[in-house]
Amino acid sequence: MLVYQDLLTGDELLSDSFPYKEIENGILWEVEGKWVTVGAVDVNIGANPSAEEGGEDEGVDDSTQKVVDIVDTFRLQEQPTYDKKGFIAYIKKYIKLLTPKLSEEDQAVFKKGIEGATKFLLPRLSDFQFFVGEGMHDDSTLVFAYYKEGSTNPTFLYFAHGLKEVKC
C-alpha cells in the first residue's frame, strides 16, 4: 500500500486506495470522495432478549454519522476559507517552502505549472472547503474539496508536488 504524506509536515493526506487523475499539467491531483456512514453497529438477532443484556427492546443505536471517506480516513482538519488576497499570499509562501524540497527536475516542472494551477483555483475559491493534515501545522499543504455540478460527493484537489510517496 502507498500512502502520500504532506512533503512539508509529514501528515498523511491520501493513499493509493483512492485513485487520482492528474489535471493542470500534473500539478494537481483530482480525487473523488464519498459520503459514508460510520459508527458503532450492535445487532442482536437472537429471539431471547433476556439472554442478550436487557429485557426490553432498546431501539436503534443513533451513534452513527455520515462523513466523507477521505476526511475521516486521514483525519483532515477543515480550515477557514480564503479570499483572493489571502490565497495568493498562501501560494507565494507555499512555493517558497516547497521548492527547496524538490529535485531540480521537479522544481522546473512545479515552477512552470504552478501559475496555471493557481489560475485554475482562484475563480473557484468560493466553492472550496479547505483542509490540512491532522497536525494542523502552519506550513501545511492545503487540500481543496468542492462539489462538481450535479454531484452529491465531494471532489478533492491535491498539489501533486506537495506529496511524498511512502510504502507501507
From Swiss-Prot:
Keywords: Calcium, Cytoplasm. Its main location: cytoplasm. One of its GO terms (molecular function) is protein domain specific binding. Gene3D superfamilies: Metal Binding Protein, Guanine Nucleotide Exchange Factor, Chain A. It holds the Pfam family TCTP. It comes from the Eukaryota. PROSITE patterns: TCTP_1, TCTP_2, TCTP_3. Disulfide bonds: none annotated. Changing residue 12 to V: Loss of function. SUPFAM superfamilies: Mss4-like. Induction: Up-regulated by momilactone B. Not regulated by light. Up-regulated by abscisic acid. One of its GO terms (cellular component) is thylakoid. InterPro entries: Mss4-like_sf (IPR011057), Mss4/transl-control_tumour (IPR011323), TCTP (IPR034737), Translation_control_tumour_CS (IPR018103), Translational_control_tumour_p (IPR018105). Disruption phenotype: Male gametophytic phenotype with normal pollen formation and germination but impaired pollen tube growth. Embryonic lethality when homozygous due to a retarded development of the embryos that eventually collapse at the silique dehiscence stage. One of its GO terms (biological process) is regulation of multicellular organism growth. Residues 1-168 form the TCTP domain. It is found in: Cytoplasm, Cytosol. Expressed in flowers, leaves and stems. Expressed in roots and siliques. Detected in seeds. Highest expression in actively dividing and differentiating cell types, such as the meristematic and division zones of the root, the embryo or the elongating tube of germinating pollen. Expressed in cotyledons, leaves, hypocotyls and roots. Detected in mitotically active tissues such as shoot apical meristems, root tips, lateral root initiation regions and anthers, and in guard cells. The keyword DNA-binding does not apply. Belongs to the TCTP family. General regulator required for the development of the entire plant. Regulates the duration of cell cycle. Probable activator of Rab GTPases and upstream regulator of the cell growth-regulating TOR (target of rapamycin) network. Might also control spatial growth in pollen tubes or root hairs via the TORC2 signaling branch. Involved in the regulation of abscisic acid- and calcium-mediated stomatal closure, but not in light or H(+)-pumping induced stomatal opening. May regulate microtubules depolymerization. Binds calcium and has a cytoprotective function. Knockdown mutants have retarded growth due to decreased cell size. PANTHER family: TRANSLATIONALLY CONTROLLED TUMOR PROTEIN-RELATED, TRANSLATIONALLY-CONTROLLED TUMOR PROTEIN 1. Homodimer. Interacts with the Rab GTPases RABA4A, RABA4B, RABF1 and RABF2B. Interacts with microtubules and heterodimers of alpha- and beta-tubulins. Cytosolic calcium positively regulates this interaction. This is Translationally-controlled tumor protein 1. It comes from Arabidopsis thaliana. The lineage of its organism: Eukaryota, Viridiplantae, Streptophyta, Embryophyta, Tracheophyta.
